[in-house]
């Protein structure tokens, strides 16, 4: 049996877009296929490796670079590593890409208006849009969308299963997975985009 080749799948997108949902589904899909895989969630890294960091650009960059550092260690040791922080700044994402090398960027597209209308149960986007919360990514703090991501999914027009299938299909086209990893069955899809929560955009609420 050939040795597993590590690579990183890096999800980026606004809070509430669907990153954590699709990343977790992908993680379980890979596990079910016997791949060595780990998932690095932006909130969990903040809690365990980045305590004390705020939401200034410098602090956000530090958190993302720490995720990139850990992802690089895992990747070079043959682990398929899934990262799903907001990672709003292109320069920092590019730094992680350069560090890791074996890097696939997945842009999870959803607009602020769409998220505020459909996936904002605590009303955080509405408060940010009203000026009641400041430093909120996508509202008064920038989110620099990728222009050349290897994979793009639109979670407003796709079901979770469709988004996952598209990611797997593109990973096969990119030579990252084989045919045995591509087909998704309903039994392994365990969460939906209706469970999304606004997270890590200035006010931290766990995104399931």
Regions from the PLM with identified roles:
Residues 15:
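The conserved Walker
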């Amino acid at each position: 049996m050939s040795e597993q080749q590590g690579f990183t799948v890096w999800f980026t997108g606004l809070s509430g877009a669907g990153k954590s949902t699709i990343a977790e589904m992908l993680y379980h899909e890979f596990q079910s296929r016997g791949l060595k895989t780990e998932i690095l969630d932006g909130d969990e890294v903040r809690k365990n490796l980045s305590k004390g960091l705020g939401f200034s650009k410098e602090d956000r960059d530090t958190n993302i670079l720490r995720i990139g550092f850990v992802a690089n260690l895992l990747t070079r040791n043959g682990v398929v590593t899934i990262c799903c922080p907001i990672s709003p700044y292109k320069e920092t994402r590019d730094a992680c890409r350069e560090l890791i090398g074996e890097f696939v960027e997945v842009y999870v597209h959803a607009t602020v208006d769409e998220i505020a209308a459909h996936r904002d149960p605590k009303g955080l986007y509405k408060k940010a849009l009203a000026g009641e919360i400041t430093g909120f990514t996508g509202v008064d703090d920038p989110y620099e969308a990728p222009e050349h991501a290897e994979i793009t999914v639109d979670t407003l027009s796709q079901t979770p299963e469709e988004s996952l299938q598209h990611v797997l299909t593109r990973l096969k086209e990119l030579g990252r997975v084989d045919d045995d990893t591509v087909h998704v069955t309903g039994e392994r899809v365990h969460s939906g985009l209706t469970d999304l929560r606004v997270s890590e955009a200035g006010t931290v609420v766990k995104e399931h």
